[in-house]
Amino acid sequence: MPIVTVTLNNKSFQLYCNNGDEEKVLSLADKLNDKIAEIKLSSPTASFDLLLVMASLNAQAEIAILTEKLYKNGFQNNNHEEEKFAETLTTIASYLENLARKMEK
């Protein structure tokens, strides 16, 4: 299982990921870091933990909105697309869980 080093708010974290998912994890980390930087502009004194919580909640809200839109557009009738979407959500959740575990250490 490969190890990927991601940097969030100038802090580096080493995470395990599935073979072939390295670029996906790095891309997700870049997007998360951008969101953290955006939040930090409006809350410059917030701790890294709080910034991460706020970014995670924003991501969850975006996922909920997109999920609702997909289902309103008949997404539930396409099992293949639903499986791909579920796989993507699982990858994101796994990444956030790994990051949370790293922060606990």
From Swiss-Prot:
Domain of life: Bacteria
Name of the protein: Uncharacterized protein RP756
Pfam families: ZapA (PF05164)
Taxonomic placement: Bacteria, Pseudomonadati, Pseudomonadota, Alphaproteobacteria, Rickettsiales
